[in-house]
Amino acid sequence: MKYDIIGDIHGCLQEFQNLTEKLGYNWSSGLPVHPDQRKLAFVGDITDRGPHSLRMIEIVWELVIHKKVAYYAPGNHCNKLYRFFLGRNVTIAHGLETTVAEYEALPSHKQNMIKEKFITLYEQSPLYHVLDEKRLLVCHAGIRQDYIGRQDKKVQTFVLYGDITGEKHADGSPVRRDWAKEYKGTTWIVYGHTPVKEPRFVNHTVNIDTGAVFGGKLTGLRYPEMETVSVPSSLPFVPEKFRPIS
């Protein structure tokens, strides 16, 4: 099986359409379909900050849950939106406010439909996907080699948030260790979460979050070809979001 793994979309629907078309997908049915049956895989954070978060929920739900032709691994923004939909006490900030504003503008029956679709998508998706006979792993923020196969709380925190130190940058964002430099496995780990200006290959890992929502690019990785394909963002460039990994 061949896969096209898509970086953090964050509600950037137009960029997602442009990227999938560049990857050879046809949208005539209203969904991206590849003539050679390649499958899409998402590294999470499909919502927040960008203009079309709810439409991205509908598309990914349709592909992953209804048609079962794609893979989705939730990100930290997905986790927070899930908790919001469950009625938990979450801070509506750091991008969630844009998704909530879209949601609250809907009539109640459409709100219920979106909520049910996202809860189903989140609950029926694993923390990470191990594909191609363990040669490929798709997740949100990365995973240590000794965590593969585990689903416990420590692994969940790592997969959703990365290798956080507990310290904070001046803007309040967490300081993260560069776990990829220590990775010695042969399974390719494809992930996102931390915006980089260009796809970052380190050992058998690839970070494909090229900051579409911050004016960078939306990137896909063609597997097993290991080729990256990108399209430019239509949004303003925010240079401070592309911080070097410490």
From Swiss-Prot:
UniProt-listed Enzyme Commission number(s): 3.6.1.17
One Gene Ontology cellular component annotation held by this UniProt entry: cytoplasm
Gene3D superfamilies: 3.60.21.10
UniProt catalytic activity: P(1),P(4)-bis(5'-guanosyl) tetraphosphate + H2O = GMP + GTP + 2 H(+)
Cofactor field: Ni(2+)
Keywords tagged on the record: GTP-binding, Hydrolase, Nickel, Nucleotide-binding
Pfam family, one: Metallophos
Annotated GO MF terms: bis(5'-nucleosyl)-tetraphosphatase (asymmetrical) activity; GTP binding; nickel cation binding; phosphatase activity
Enzyme class: hydrolase
Function: Asymmetrically hydrolyzes Ap4p to yield AMP and ATP.
Family (UniProt): Belongs to the PrpE family.
Name of this chain's protein: Bis(5'-nucleosyl)-tetraphosphatase PrpE [asymmetrical]
Organism: Bacillus cereus (strain ZK / E33L)
